[in-house]
């Protein structure tokens, strides 16, 4: 999950950086797009919105900006359909959007790897959408998650983001270009509030359950929300032993969800206050209605 990097008192552990790759991409003839993690809202105060990031990224030289919360809507809808099938078949499943959790399953519970949802992560969903329109596009994910780097390097999922930057890495590039985040209104919104809340522990479950309601699936599965690595391990052990009473596990390797990621810019409690203020201003669009605005048929969610 990357927590060790910031916990090590000697600074002995580091992660691969894609800063040079991103800079070279910006200098190339290819179009380069930024995909911002849902956890971004609230990290830099109540006045720094997704609109603030969109403007800053344009000033740096990126060709486009999309909030990964839109990918959250896409993942929620796809995973809802997948879970309905699994529920009817009596199969237990675990979520696939947290790479730290996926790494844990594959490393420590390899016999349960087939329980991982086949639905791609929100980051990958947005990247595939962009590349369906422009196959030569370069996609860059920015967020508080170090494990996302392992998702793009190790998991080798077709159409996934090309590079991943932490907030500090992106801000270093911004600093070199003399660009700062400026206060902006909340008029820029591409995802439902459910997609935005993917970054919170329990947010994936809420979005998937909402999608089930919107598609009138007629089922109410029991979902175990594993908050942090310790809980993830505990519930995976129960599932392995056949003693998990729930139908699905939502696994978040970081406590609090992505907002508690190892490369977060701010304290999680401080971020929560700002984040709540921002999300209250989001409109109440539904997940499935929102996805009608995008060409979902042009790429696969699995």
Language-model regions, residue ranges each:
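Iron-sulfur-associated redox domains of electron-transfer enzymes in respiratory
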Residues: 15-302
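Cysteine-centered iron-sulfur cluster-binding motifs in ferredoxin-type domains/subunits
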Residues: 1-11, 253, 257-258
